[in-house]
Amino acid sequence: MEGSKRDIIENSNNGNNKGVVIEELGETYYTNSKPSTSADCKYFRDSFEFGSNNNNNNNNNNNNNNNNNNNNNNNNNNNNNNNNNNNNEEKSNNETEKTLESNGDTTTTTTTNNNNNNNNNNNNNNNNNNNNNNNNNNNNNNNNNNTNSSNDIYMNSPSSTLSSPGNAGNNLPIGCTKPNVPKSPYSPSPPHLYKSNSTSYLKSSFFSGNGSSSSSSSTTTTNINSNNSNTNTYSTSTNVKKNNSNTNSNTNNNTNGNTNTNSNSNKKNINSNSSDNIIINDTADIMNRRRDRFKSFSWTIGESNSNSKFSELSMISSKCKSIKSEFTPLFETLTVFDESDKIRHSLIQNHYKTLLIQNPASPNRTLLTNLLQRRGHNLTTCPIDINHVLQLLQKESFSLFIFDPNESIINNTSNSISSNEPISLSSSSSYYNNNNSNNNSVNNNNNNNSGNSTNNNSPSSHTPNSPMIFQPIVSNICSNSGGSGNNSPHHIDNNNNSNQQQQQQQQQQQQQQQHQHQQQQQQSSSTTATTNNSCTLNQQQQQQQQQQQQQQQQQQQQQQSQPTTPTQSTQSPTTSISFSKKKNLTINTSFKTSPMSSPKSFNKPSQSPQNIFNNFSNTYNPNNIEFCKILKSKLTEFETVIVLTESTDPSEFCQYIDAGATDYIPQPISPILLDLRLTTCQKLVNNNLHLKKAESLKDATRKMVTCIENSPDCVEIWDPSGHIQYLNLAFSEMTGFARWELLGKEFSNLIDNTEIIPNMWATLTDKKTWNGFIRTRHNNNTLIYFEASISPVLDQFQQILYYNCTKRDVTQKRIDEESKTLEQNKIIEKSRLRLSMMSHDIRTPMSNIIGMADLLLDTSLSQHQHHYLEIIKNSSNTLLTIINDILDISKIEAGKLDIDYESFDFNATVSQVVESMAQRVQSKGLELLSYVDPKIPNILIGPSSRLNQILTNLLGNSLKFTDKGEISICCLLNDETDSEYEIKVDVRDTGIGIKKEALPLLFKAFTQAEGTITRQYGGSGLGLAICKELVHLAFNGEISVESQYGHGSTFTCILKFKKFLPSDSQNLLPASSPLQQQQQQQQHQQQTQFHQHQQQTQFHQHQQQQLQHQQHQQHQQLQQQQQQQQQLQQQLQQHQQHQLQQRQHHQQQLQQQQHHHHQQVHLQQQQQHEHDAQHNQHIQQQQQQQQQQQQQQQQHEHNNNGHHNSHGHNHHGSHHNHNHQHNNNNNNITINKLQHQEKKQKSNEQQLESITENSFSPIVEPMVISDPDTPEALNISQSPSPQSIHNGTTINQQPTSPLNTLGSKFDFSGAKMLFIERNDTSRGNLFKQLLAWNIQLELVEDGESGFRKWKQSIESNSPYSIIIMDLNTPGVDGASLPMRIKKELELMQQHLQQQQEQEQQQQQEQQQSELQKQPDVENKNSSQNNDNNNNNNKSNSSGGNQCIYRSPIIMLMPIQFLNSQLEDNLKDAGVCAILSKPIRMSQLADVFMMYLGPNSEHNNNNNYNNNNGNGYLNGGGGGGGSVNGTGNGTLQVGMSNDGGNGCGVVSFWNKQRRASAEEQEQDPSKLLGKVLVVDDNHINIQILSKMLQTVGCEVDSVLSGADALAKINQSSGDSYDAIFLDIQMPDMDGFQVSRKIREREKKFSLPRVAIIATTANVFKEDQLKCFDAGMDDFISKPIKRAEIKEIIKKYGKNGNHQSGSAYSLYKLS
């Protein structure tokens, strides 16, 4: 219906009114026969496909009486009748096909059957004619009603009218009515109908308005006896559902030959005639049902809009209250999805695969295939073979299975069919249609005449005219595509044949079936399975003729061989149904359908043939049921199985449902019906897929939960706030608490060691995983230790959902570890004691050997003896080094390595290591180079001794495996943080290299790369192992190696040092190593692990205290910062005030100077006027005396060289204007100088102010600021109070930056240097350093190139400020290159002098010639004075331009080449300084400051010459070199020839030599007087005594501590200056002796004596014991001379010894 709702017309009382029953999902509605308009039925046209189908073919049961005398004729007539019937049926079928294909308007198909029977009685007996006719009509009506089991309404009329047979074909419109229909005896449909999720579709049936007749459709049958022919007219009707079935049995018994008995009975056939979707509920409440229920249906059957269907089904389900229990599964399945998950037709594609189980020749194949492909199914087909299906299931999975058992050939193992005989049916009562027929009319014809009887084996029963021969497989080719075959009425004759006859018949039938099967295979190969699978008429006739001929021959043979029995009766022409050996039934090729029956059992004698074929269709086969069961057993509950069936019997449906089918589709298969069912199945499949996923998820969740619950470890889940949400069973077992006791509480209740909570919670809130140990108390108050791992679980937005905590009980493991640790500590203590004893025992004899070797070397020995002693000493030192390495690695492994952190000079430490290794490296002919990044600060905090050890081991390793080339060490600043520096140290060599496979073994103890290396180079293999451990423990760094075999190796260390701060110098104490800290923490935990317990309140208090403490610290820090800022502000204010005062003072000074200058100028002017007056007075006198003194004046002018005095006096008669201008110029120069000094002073003040503002570190180092004008630069020292800056004085202030480096200390801007070096690495390192000092550097590789460069610089008037050359550079050859430069300078000087002499001679000649030409004396005098002045200026200018440039030369040479003879030669060649290689940058900086700095020594004795602005030294003078300011402010150095030596300054090496000579001149006996040596070893006493005697000490010795105390008591008047005391002595050790001495001094108030401990122990504990016992210092054995000298300087008479000085220094370090 469209637009508006349809009103239901009340039921009419007219009994002739007919209506349509419309049902859906168990509810029945009725339509009236008279609608208001034809448009009301538009939903029929819109919702259904139109077509005509002969659903009801009414056949009259004509009882043919055959006489005994006319058996042959009857047989012939039967054959003829069969032929005629076949022809008529073929024609009717053809007509029906045409009607279906066309769009005609007729709905009635008439079929005429002419049965030419000569002896046919059409009217039956006279006494029962009316009854028989009525019965026949009723039978026909029943047949029609029962055979119409369609589920769709087929209409051809465009006017939407249905043809009603009850009105003799009148077209009646359909209206709505509610007739009085008796209550249906049927119960509601079984639950499986709703379980299948089938959609709602219409089922309609006509009914009688008054309810007097149980038939809803009538059939008019006309029997015409004309020329022995019967004409039957059948009228088709719509598909009608019948509740009551009528069974009509006609029996004709006549003693004369014809007896007709007609019986009409109305029976309730419960098990028959029920379509799978035809559901009729109790109709008593039909009148009371709501009308809007029917109107709400949107009539969208067959449409693809699944959303509307879904809404309709949801609406219907809400109103089906009466079938709520049955509809619930479907309702829950369909309503489980929300709006976004609704199933749409376009989205169902490719969601699942479909398996179509069907024989290739099935009539439904094309329809199903096309429909499934159109709906987007991934379709796979296979025959009905369980093995084939199972193979497919193993390969892939399917979600939908469609099983079509029609025309199937399946192995049957059941014994339900025991008879092999064909079943004959009466041809007169036979009919066929396209639907299932469940009413069967059976005629039992019993003839008493035995002579003319015909049994089932007679040829007449198998005549070609029989239309109901069931043959195997043939129907697969010629069946109708519209639906499966239907059951037809069957006539069964009772046979009394013997067993032998039955066996023969079975054999013959088997042969026939095999032959027919072969023919069908040949035909099926040439035909295709289309929607219309019908064969042509010629093919059908040929097949029928062949089959009939074979059957006739077989029957004739049987009749000849076997006589008929008296009980056999003659029959009219029949249709045979044959059961093959395989128990499968098929039909003849002449039929559109294949009526096929499979009775439940033939073994029941009481069951009539009518009941046998009345209940089951041809698709019901026990093998099909078994197949369905087997298929379902191999599937899961989520796969859907649909069965195609021909039956309308609910019992058969139940069989398939019970066998595992989800749904079924009855015949005939309509595209609309199939599409609806597939839509429902697709929904079900989709739901099943969701359910399958849900089930798998549920299973996985169940497994996961089971695993977590039964896990042996504790599993906890916390919410983001830290509250416990879940605990597994293991928690209760381990802790003894019930889970409910702790659920919802904070996790801190489970932690006993609450000190870990802040760090843990900070890690977790930072979204990181925390791993550690948690201590928990058991319910019985015992401690439990857990190894825990807690990780946050994040969502897609990286937000914390919850925390997952996993704990493992490690209590027993922890107890075992603690016991093992205690045992190991005991063992370590014992081994440490043994190691200490062994160290003393080993080092003592080694120290004796080395000491004696040193003493012997000081005696007069031969060359060979001296060589032998050197070998002994070197071997002893090597052995001592190995012993020290063994002790170090033992201490490292024991965790007792001492690491002392102190402030030290990094550059000095590296330089000391390099210098100590230089002689060994250079003795092998190798080059040792070092470079320290200028950015690295001088002062760092770290273990300097361990740095020394690491560098020594690395350099020693490189030296061992390098025979040629070089070894270099490079230190770079890798990174810098707020608190530390990261320095990268690279040690490179050009040795043998290391193979790749040996690199992993390189840093292991007692291992080397190859075994042959140990034999060739020696060594213990401990050096690199110790380096690795020291780098990790002492510097928290890393060490790595890169090597190329045969080309050398590079060892890289990353070391971390702390920054030096002023507070560190006061609070710097020896810090323990990270390993020791870890051990101390472990010991502390071991001591307190069983005694710490805090409650939850304590945890909160602890947190609050921490917060308060943090706030307090922050407040203090803020206060400190504020105080510091205030101090800085105060300092700045003071400094600014001081600057203002200085500026005012400078201004006052400038004003005074200017005032003084003005006064001087005024005085000079007055003097000048006076002088002019006096000059005018004496002009005449001068003119008279001029001629006489001319020669004297020329000589005097030549000597003075035109020099003018500062007061402007001119004794040579210069003009007054000239003198006045000269004075003005001098005044201007003085004023300019003062202004320039003022500007310079202001710039220095601004620079100092910026230094003060930007300084944050109190580290104070001198800084050189180059100044071209002032003779002295600013020198910043450590004093915080500023001083005046006037006249080059120094001030004390903070440095420019907190980073105090060697590069930041010096600035030599403008200096130009020439470096002559052959080694590329050395040139590169020096180039980097000099760039930091702002020096312009030029590099050359040999002496010849260096000489050319130097000469070019001289010629271009841009000489080098300094020259550095290597002694081993080619072309230098020791002193040859400096000597060559010196000679070249001498030649240049001589040439310059000659030029000057020539110029002077020329000037004298010019002057004499000019004097002679003067006319008068006055003019001569004036011109002479002018010429003299000009000549003086020229000579002055020429002398200033021609200078001798002598650059300072610095020579680099290896230490091993240093000797006095070479030094003297280099000095004579003009070398100013000699530096040993490798170069120490601090020494190089000192040399540069000596020759390039503003405070250089030779600058103090030189005068500035600013006449021409170039500032070069005049070569004519005899003064020394000077540093002068050029026009551009650069520094340049000139050096004069000093008496032939060419060096006017004291050289650097002379300073060193003088310092060493001064040290040697000091008397050692004056440093330390009387000394006491206490030792229990005679050899040690001899060695130490001899060393002390060599430095001039008076030595006393004793062998025990008691003797030492006695000796000290005896010498009370003459006390000792120092006591060298051994620690380990038998009777009284050194600690006791030292305490006794200190007690004695305190008791008698004696002066403190220096006590120096001599010990072979190197452990820190022993050293601390020495200081605690009152000792002042210690010396480790073996004792060296250098250490003795240092002790003498420190504690001698002239030393700065104080009480406990060594101990205090040790504490600070």
Curated annotation (Swiss-Prot):
Q: Name one GO molecular function term.
A: ATP binding
Boundaries of each Histidine kinase domain copy?
A: 837-1059
Annotated Response regulatory domain residues: 1312-1492, 1570-1692
Q: Where is the composition biased (Basic residues)?
A: 1204-1221
Annotated stretches, region: Disordered: 52-192, 206-276, 413-535, 554-615, 1068-1112, 1137-1298, 1390-1440
Pfam family example for this protein?
HATPase_c
Q: Could you give a single Gene Ontology term from the biological process aspect? A: regulation of sorocarp development
Q: Where is the composition biased (Low complexity)?
A: 53-87, 106-148, 413-466, 486-535, 554-576, 1075-1112, 1137-1153, 1176-1194, 1390-1412, 1420-1440
In what residue span(s) does the PAC domain sit? 770-822
Q: Which reaction does it catalyse?
A: ATP + protein L-histidine = ADP + protein N-phospho-L-histidine
At the top of the EC hierarchy, this enzyme's class is: transferase
Where do Basic and acidic residues bias regions lie? 88-100
Record key words, sorted: ATP-binding, Kinase, Nucleotide-binding, Phosphoprotein, Repeat, Transducer, Transferase, Two-component regulatory system
Task: Quote the EC number.
Answer: 2.7.13.3
What are the Phosphohistidine sites (modified residues) in this protein? 840
- 4-aspartylphosphate, modified sites: 1366, 1622
The molecule here is called Hybrid signal transduction histidine kinase L
Source organism (scientific name) = Dictyostelium discoideum
